[in-house]
Amino acid sequence: MRMGGSFVVLSGVIAIVVGSVLGGCARYFISGAVARRLGETFPWGTMTINVTGAFLIGIFGALATHPGSMFASPNPWLFAVTGFLGCYTTVSSFSLQTLTLARNGEPMHALGNVAFSVGLCLAAVSCGFLLADGLGG
């Protein structure tokens, strides 16, 4: 029985590692592409990452409530949410970029970043949850 428990833990760790690698790479490429396209004077790349991540976690969260969904079992959740989205989204970058805006004499941009990021992320997670819940139910 101990061997089976070790396998479950190891498979969960592998799911997290693979998801983390893919999520980190996706964040790097998408955030960079958005920043190059829209400019780097405002953290559009980080906002895009966090809003799309919120949308995706809404989808996965809704799917996890459906007993037949693959996201109702541990490893797909560990891969997609703990691994991929854990490395894809970033509160630390959001926080540093907001502080940098404020310290650079742009307090309105800093407040705008907070308001838009939080508002858009809450809207995105709600939309993702409603979309997936509607399709799955």
From Swiss-Prot:
Report whether Transmembrane helix shows up as a keyword of the record: yes
Which superkingdom heads the taxonomic lineage of this protein's source?
Bacteria
Alphabetized GO MF terms:
fluoride channel activity; fluoride transmembrane transporter activity; metal ion binding
What membrane topology was assigned to this protein in its record?
Multi-pass membrane protein
Catalyzed reactions: fluoride(in) = fluoride(out)
Instruction: Note how its activity is modulated.
Output: Na(+) is not transported, but it plays an essential structural role and its presence is essential for fluoride channel function.
Localisation per UniProt entry: Cell inner membrane
Sorted keywords for this record are:
Cell inner membrane, Cell membrane, Ion channel, Ion transport, Membrane, Metal-binding, Sodium, Transmembrane, Transmembrane helix, Transport
Transmembrane intervals: 3-23, 44-64, 76-96, 111-131
Q: Which one GO biological process term can you cite for this protein?
A: cellular detoxification of fluoride
One Gene Ontology CC term in the entry: plasma membrane
Record-listed Na(+) binding positions: 86, 89
Keyword field contains Ion transport:
yes
Q: What is its main location?
A: membrane
Function noted in UniProt? Fluoride-specific ion channel. Important for reducing fluoride concentration in the cell, thus reducing its toxicity.
Q: Which family does it belong to?
A: Belongs to the fluoride channel Fluc/FEX (TC 1.A.43) family.
HAMAP family found in the cross-reference section: FluC (MF_00454)
Protein name in UniProt: Fluoride-specific ion channel FluC 2
Q: Which organism is it from?
A: Bradyrhizobium diazoefficiens (strain JCM 10833 / BCRC 13528 / IAM 13628 / NBRC 14792 / USDA 110)
